[in-house]
């Protein structure tokens, strides 16, 4: 069967890998020049089953209201005359009940556990390297109320098989000595030894190389403009290729893996995908003093930031990512939000990054 994968990010390339392994003829199409150049480019790099509590939870509505208008808020809604944003927002609110939150935690833990297991098997099968670390993920809290609020979800995750252990501030510093600078502010922490971290962009690029060697075709620099139907089925993809020429491509099956842009292609087909773009921010810093930089991947729950450390032949670097801005497809960077991330890094690990 000929399969066309739309999108060369982490999900698109991974789908292409497994489809090729099953014997299909696979073509991947993406508008960027290289795989993994958008959502997968510089994210937080955590493989975090322990991060299973959804944004939509009982405490979220009040927090969102408090954060409205705060440029450096962890979650910033910029209200727009955009029906898709309002529909997504209403769905978000419907999922903030205790019952929905418990259900969604169950679903996320199940999916996350399966995904982590699949990644580990893929690593064994291919030997792929992507600056991965298997030292777990530590969630730390500097607000006692935030810490108390995390205990219930952590217990539910343990009951579901995710070993997210509640630990003291002293135990947190023992696991990650770089937190000693903020020991007086630590209210507590949780630690999941089975969780991992790694460079998502490097993973995608390395897996794409394996796919190409196995016969997967990549058509990069191609702008997908529409999915056309005939007889109630997708008949072909319309695109403008890297040379600016119009093309039609036909397959027996199609994988839509374009992240927040997927709804724009699906909507003309009468398919409404409940997906809305969230703009995240990240900073990557070379490690200046290895003794001051963290080793374990961290989550700062109060500021909604994650921290990963990557080690390669070119040296160590810190990836700090997080916060979310819901502002449609706007790609402009807000300097206030960028500075807030850098400021938090300096508070937690002064002198660690350059």
Question: What residue ranges belong to the model's regions?
Answer:
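Rossmann-like flavin
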Residues: 86-209
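Predominantly flavin-linked oxidoreductase catalytic cores and closely associated redox partners
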Residues: 151, 155-184, 191-277
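Glycine-rich FAD pyrophosphate-binding loop
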Residues: 20-41
């Amino acid at each position: 069967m000929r399969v066309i994968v739309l999108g060369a990010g982490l999900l698109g390339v991974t789908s292409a890998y497994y489809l090729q392994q099953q014997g299909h003829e696979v073509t991947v199409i993406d508008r960027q020049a290289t795989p993994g150049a958008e959502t997968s480019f510089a994210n937080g790099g955590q493989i975090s089953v322990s991060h299973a509590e959804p944004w939509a939870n009982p405490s979220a509505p009040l927090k969102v209201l408090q954060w409205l208008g705060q440029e450096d808020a962890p979650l910033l809604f910029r209200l727009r005359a955009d029906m898709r944003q309002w529909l997504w927002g209403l769905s978000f609110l419907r999922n903030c009940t205790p019952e929905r939150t418990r259900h969604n935690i169950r679903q996320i833990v199940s999916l996350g556990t399966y995904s982590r297991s699949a990644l580990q098997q893929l690593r064994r099968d291919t030997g792929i390297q992507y600056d991965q670390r298997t030292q777990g993920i530590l969630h730390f809290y500097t607000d006692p109320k935030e810490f108390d609020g995390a205990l219930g979800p952590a217990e539910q995750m343990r009951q579901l098989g995710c070993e997210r252990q509640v630990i003291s501030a002293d135990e947190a510093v023992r696991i990650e000595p770089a937190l000693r600078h903020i020991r007086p502010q630590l209210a507590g922490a949780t630690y999941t030894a089975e969780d991992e971290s790694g460079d998502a962009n490097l993973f995608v690029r390395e897996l794409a190389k394996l796919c190409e060697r196995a016969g997967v075709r990549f058509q990069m620099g191609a702008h997908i403009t529409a999915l056309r139907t005939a007889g109630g089925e997708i008949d072909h993809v319309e695109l403008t290729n890297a040379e600016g020429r119009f093309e039609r491509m036909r397959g027996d099956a199609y994988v839509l893996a374009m992240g927040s842009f997927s709804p724009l292609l699906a909507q003309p087909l009468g398919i409404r995908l409940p997906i809305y773009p969230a703009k995240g921010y990240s900073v990557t810093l070379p490690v200046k003093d290895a003794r001051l930089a963290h080793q374990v991947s961290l989550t700062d729950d109060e500021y909604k930031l994650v921290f990963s450390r990557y080690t390669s032949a070119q040296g160590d670097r810190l990836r700090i990512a997080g916060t979310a801005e819901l502002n449609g497809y706007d790609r402009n960077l807000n300097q206030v939000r960028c500075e807030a991330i850098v400021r938090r890094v300096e508070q937690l690990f002064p002198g660690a990054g350059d």
